From Swiss-Prot:
Name by which UniProt lists this protein: H/ACA ribonucleoprotein complex subunit 2-like protein
Bridged cysteine pairs (disulfide): none
Subunit structure of this chain's protein: Component of the small nucleolar ribonucleoprotein particle containing H/ACA-type snoRNAs (H/ACA snoRNPs). Component of the telomerase holoenzyme complex.
Organism this protein belongs to: Xenopus tropicalis
Gene: nhp2
High-level lineage: Eukaryota, Metazoa, Chordata, Craniata, Vertebrata
UniProt GO cellular component terms: nucleolus; sno(s)RNA-containing ribonucleoprotein complex; telomerase holoenzyme complex
Length: 149
């Protein structure tokens, strides 16, 4: 007697994604400057293009290390990360070194944009000539956001 194998379905069940407005309810108090709906979408697209070139730094520890080494780029942080002590020092580091940063509403969407099944709370997008136009557009928009102080 053998066990019957379960048929593996090739279709991945889609999780119902929440709208931008629904995600805003989960933001933590330090999530400023928050990217708007259009800028969030642009940042996710830029992350997807950067991941193809392997031109991205993901995670608090890695981003912190490369900011300290003087690497330049755009820092994108998830606004729904708790506890905030995990990454509350990153904006100060960015401001000291003149690196533009922005918050997006969802860490799971940020992780998905980076090609990961796991949520990601901090990403550093480095410039590259293959997606320079999208990068420059995002850089301009992130620098135009008002700083929280």
């Amino acid at each position: 007697m053998t066990k019957a194998k379960k048929e593996e379905s090739e279709e991945v069940p889609e999780t119902p994604s929440k709208s931008y407005d629904e995600l805003l309810a989960y933001l933590n108090p330090i999530a400023k400057p928050l990217a708007g709906r259009k800028l969030t979408k642009k940042l996710y697209k830029c992350v997807k293009k950067a991941i193809k070139q392997k031109n991205i730094r993901r995670g608090v520890k890695e981003v912190q290390k490369f900011i300290n080494k003087g690497e330049k780029g755009i820092v994108v942080m998830a606004g729904d990360t708790l506890p905030i002590e995990v990454y509350c020092h990153i904006p100060v580091m960015c401001e000291d070194r003149g690196i533009p940063y922005s918050y997006v509403p969802s860490k799971s969407d940020l992780g998905a944009a980076a090609g990961s099944k796991r949520p990601t709370c901090v990403i550093l997008i480095k410039p590259h000539e293959d997606y320079q136009e999208a990068y420059d557009e995002c850089l301009e928009d992130v620098q135009a956001l008002p700083l929280p102080y």
